[in-house]
């Protein structure tokens, strides 16, 4: 039961042509647009596909799985096997991919990254989805941005594990003091949050035992293994 996470900046150079053409999804074959936002989204897809391809090789799973990516009814990309799952997130110029291999059952993962481009009205946003106790906790925190994106990213990661949109943010109950999360929109597992990367990161894994996670970053033309410092760990849907 091993999990792999890779991230990279879309402005870096990637040998995208090295991906066999038969492993490209239809969205990557679409003609280029003159619209800059569309171009950036297209670049994010390419980088995400490249990182997923790399992680499949690292995990020793067949890269031919890329040919069979399909979409759930909610639009979540998925593989046609139960023991391998992946999820993708991008924000600003950053892309992150999570891949989990579980030889003992189903793999379910979700990931969210946020690279803030501007300061927001955090209390007003929290009022839409956080409980009064969580909002009270937030007012006592010194690092407002970090605290807000902890509350936001963990919800997104949990919901993305099932392909559920942010309309259900308020359906995720977050106890920052006990470090527990409850939601009917995901199975039991663990969530990890970090603020030590060039972006905020949260990911969910449907595993209650000790996690085995390997982190990689694309830099200078190689996918280099790295470490995650000062991570915060949560129990998700823990039985009492």
UniProtKB/Swiss-Prot annotation:
Residues involved in Mg(2+) binding: 112, 114, 156
GO molecular function annotations of the record: holo-[acyl-carrier-protein] synthase activity; magnesium ion binding
Keyword field: Magnesium, Metal-binding, Transferase
One cellular component (GO) term of this entry: cytosol
BP terms from Gene Ontology: lysine biosynthetic process via aminoadipic acid
UniProt superkingdom: Bacteria
SUPFAM superfamilies: 4'-phosphopantetheinyl transferase
Required cofactor names: Mg(2+)
InterPro entries: 4-PPantetheinyl_Trfase_dom (IPR008278), 4-PPantetheinyl_Trfase_dom_sf (IPR037143), P-Pant_transferase_sf (IPR050559)
Catalytic class of the enzyme: transferase
Pfam families the record matches: ACPS
E.C. code: 2.7.8.-
Function noted in UniProt: May transfer the 4'-phosphopantetheine moiety from coenzyme A (CoA) to a serine residue of a carrier protein domain.
PANTHER family: L-AMINOADIPATE-SEMIALDEHYDE DEHYDROGENASE-PHOSPHOPANTETHEINYL TRANSFERASE, PHOSPHOPANTETHEINE TRANSFERASE
Similarity-based family: Belongs to the P-Pant transferase superfamily. Gsp/Sfp/HetI/AcpT family.
Official protein name in the record: Putative 4'-phosphopantetheinyl transferase PM0116
Natural source organism: Pasteurella multocida (strain Pm70)
């Amino acid at each position: 039961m091993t999990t792999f996470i890779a991230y990279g900046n879309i402005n870096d150079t990637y040998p995208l042509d090295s991906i066999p053409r038969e492993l490209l999804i239809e969205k990557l074959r679409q003609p280029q647009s003159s619209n800059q936002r569309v171009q950036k989204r297209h670049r994010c897809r390419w980088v995400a596909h490249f990182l997923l391809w790399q992680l499949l090789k690292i995990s020793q799973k067949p890269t031919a799985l890329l040919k069979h990516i399909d979409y759930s009814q909610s639009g979540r990309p998925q593989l046609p096997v139960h023991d391998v799952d992946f999820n993708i997130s991008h924000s600003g110029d950053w892309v992150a991919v999570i891949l989990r291999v579980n030889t003992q059952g189903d793999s379910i993962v979700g990931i969210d990254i946020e690279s803030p481009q501007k300061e927001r009205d955090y209390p007003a946003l929290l009022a839409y989805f956080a409980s009064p106790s969580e909002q009270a906790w937030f007012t006592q925190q010194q690092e407002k941005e970090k605290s807000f994106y902890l509350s936001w990213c963990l919800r997104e990661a949990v919901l993305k594990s099932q392909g559920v949109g942010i309309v259900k943010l308020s359906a995720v109950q977050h106890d920052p003091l006990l470090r527990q999360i409850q939601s009917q929109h995901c199975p039991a597992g663990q969530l990890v949050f970090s603020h030590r990367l060039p972006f905020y990161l949260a990911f969910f894994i449907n595993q209650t035992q000790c996690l085995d996670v390997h982190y990689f970053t694309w830099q200078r033309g190689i996918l280099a293994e790295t470490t995650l410092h000062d991570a915060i760990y949560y129990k998700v849907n823990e039985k009492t």
